[in-house]
């Protein structure tokens, strides 16, 4: 499938993210995510001590990348996992048989089998709730530092963000292009 110009994309601005997990909590509440699982979280990565006594670390969003060539879609035996016309990788819960193939195939390890329903679950940009009502995803709406941007790839504000040189996408050879863009920043803490 070709990378759609009108598809939905998200940008996680690591320069603005403070790792507060407000996005994780909002998602869990709205989507009734069971204890011990998540559709989105922010991880702290690359802690290292620099020679000047500063600690360097990075806040990284971990969620579905909405891959162009999603391995989770290609392994699904029932067609429950699919990429919709907006570029969102979805799970049709009525067709999911809980085989776990999509969970195992995800190169980013962001799917899980919901123990309450027995079907696969993951971030879908709140497509069936907030997005359907014309609102941005829950994570975007609660971010206190405006570190998350969401919109269609052909919108001017989104184009401005994704065109910056610091913006990158986490790639995996078998997934193709992904719809989660990131602006990298390494935070510092300590004495200079």
Curated annotation (Swiss-Prot):
Q: Which SUPFAM superfamilies match?
A: 4Fe-4S ferredoxins
The main location is membrane
| Protein's membrane topology | Peripheral membrane protein
Q: Where does [4Fe-4S] cluster 2 bind?
A: 27, 123, 126, 139
Alphabetized GO MF terms: 4 iron, 4 sulfur cluster binding; metal ion binding
Q: How is the cofactor bound?
A: Binds 4 [4Fe-4S] clusters per subunit.
Binding sites annotated in the UniProt record for [4Fe-4S] cluster 4: 76, 96, 99, 102
A cellular component term (GO) from this record? Answer: plasma membrane
Q: Check the record and name the InterPro entries matching this protein.
A: 4Fe4S_Fe-S-bd (IPR017896), 4Fe4S_Fe_S_CS (IPR017900), ET_IronSulfur_Cluster-Binding (IPR050954)
> What does the entry list as the binding residues for [4Fe-4S] cluster 3?
64, 67, 72, 106
Q: Locate the residues binding [4Fe-4S] cluster 1.
A: 17, 20, 23, 143
What keyword terms does UniProt attach to this protein? 4Fe-4S, Cell inner membrane, Cell membrane, Electron transport, Iron, Iron-sulfur, Membrane, Metal-binding, Repeat, Transport
- Primary role: Component of the PhsABC thiosulfate reductase that catalyzes the reduction of thiosulfate to sulfite and hydrogen sulfide, with menaquinol as the sole electron donor. Proton motive force (PMF) is required to drive transmembrane electron transfer within the reductase. The PhsB subunit transfers electrons between PhsC and PhsA.
Q: How does it assemble?
A: Composed of three subunits: PhsA, PhsB and PhsC.
Q: What is this protein called?
A: Thiosulfate reductase electron transfer subunit PhsB
Q: What is the protein's species of origin? A: Salmonella typhimurium (strain LT2 / SGSC1412 / ATCC 700720)
Specify the taxonomic lineage.
Bacteria, Pseudomonadati, Pseudomonadota, Gammaproteobacteria, Enterobacterales
